Design a protein with these regions (language model features):
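C-terminal cap/substrate-recognition subdomain and adjoining C-terminal extension
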Residues: 69-207
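Alpha-helical substrate-recognition element adjacent to the catalytic core
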Residues: 1-120, 198
Length: 207
């Protein structure tokens, strides 16, 4: 029986990449999106790509970050799926290589139990181009998942993970139910449930 569900945020619970929305404000959307794609496809180290992309955001007003973070388009079926999983007695958590400004706000809307992500450093109301947090490396999600499993007393067979990119691979290694959601090929290969349609409720039919 499944007891723990862990979802990625960008392009999984949310329809898009938070950092790409920030970059569009600075007119560098295409440049940042290209780096994001390289990282999600596994062609670029996640830590390096994160530093590079956040560095390009230096000078962006934090008020703009908050406004964008609070107006993101959530994935169809996200709220309903989380609600149903919780009704089935599962703990639902969000792991994101993105940012607390977005995952913290979405927690109250989508209803998951906790979020682990990164924090954009700001000074005098503007981004400094620096970032820190729980989810900065390729191994971060797998590392945090193992810690959560230990705390909750949950094993791999009782764990569901759902993501779309290469930085989700580490958590796929520690879960019995592995959902690749509109995912890159590198992640699909490791999944035992593959969903091609942007509708998270499809998970409910398969578990």
């Amino acid at each position: 029986m499944l007891k723990l569900a862990v979802f990625d945020f960008d392009s999984t619970l949310m329809d898009g990449e938070t950092i790409d929305f920030f970059a569009q404000e600075l007119g560098i959307g295409e440049e940042v999106a290209k780096i994001t794609e390289e990282a999600m496809s596994g062609r670029l180290d996640f830590f390096e790509s994160l530093q590079k992309r956040v560095g390009l955001l230096k000078g962006l007003e934090y008020s703009v970050v908050e406004k964008i973070s609070q107006n993101l388009p959530y994935m169809p079926g996200a709220k309903e799926t989380i609600s149903e999983l919780k009704n089935r007695g599962m703990t639902v958590v969000c792991f994101s290589g993105g940012f607390r400004s977005a995952t913290g706000f979405a927690k109250n809307i989508l209803g998951y139990d906790a979020d682990f992500s990164n924090v954009l450093h700001q000074k005098n109301g503007k981004l400094t181009g620096l970032v820190g947090g729980d989810m900065m490396f390729n191994f971060s999600k797998g590392d945090m998942l193992q810690r959560l499993q230990n705390i909750l007393g949950v094993n791999e067979d009782e764990t569901l993970v759902c993501g779309d990119g290469a930085n989700d691979l580490s958590m796929f290694a520690h879960a019995g139910t592995r959902v690749a959601f509109c995912a890159r090929e590198i992640l699909e290969k490791e999944a035992n449930i593959v969903i091609k349609k942007k509708d998270l409720t499809q998970i409910l039919e398969k578990i």
